[in-house]
Design a protein with these regions (language model features):
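Short, charged recognition helix plus adjacent turn
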Residues: 59, 69-75
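Short, basic-rich loop-to-helix N-cap that marks the start of a DNA-contacting helix
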Residues: 46-56
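A detector for short, charged/polar N-terminal pre-domain segments
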Residues: 1-9
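Short, conserved catalytic or interaction motifs in soluble domains
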Residues: 44, 63, 70
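Residue-level detection of the helix-turn-helix DNA-binding "recognition helix"
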Residues: 19, 33, 44, 73
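Short alpha-helical DNA-recognition segment
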Residues: 22-41
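Short basic helix-loop element that most often maps to the first helix and adjoining turn
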Residues: 12-27, 56
Length: 75
């Protein structure tokens, strides 16, 4: 899997989980302690996040990092 497609799949997984929980990008960003632009860029697959950012997002979405990556990998 190429790096750009990995980022795109990860972003789609985060977007799907966020919308399932009825969270806006702004709300998720606030809960995770990151800027709203980071969430938007991540969901579009144009941001390469740190593990700490992914961990914060996963925690607020109620999933583990493993679940987040498995969901993205299955796309």
């Amino acid at each position: 899997m190429r790096s750009r497609s990995i980022l795109r799949s990860l972003g789609q997984e985060i977007r799907d989980l966020r919308t399932q929980k009825n969270l806006s990008q702004e709300t998720l960003a606030g809960l995770a302690g990151i800027h709203t632009n980071v969430v938007g860029r991540l969901e579009r697959g144009i941001y390469n996040p740190t593990v700490l950012i992914l961990a914060a997002i996963a925690l607020k979405l109620g999933v583990t990092l493993e679940q987040l990556f498995k969901g993205a990998e299955g796309r």
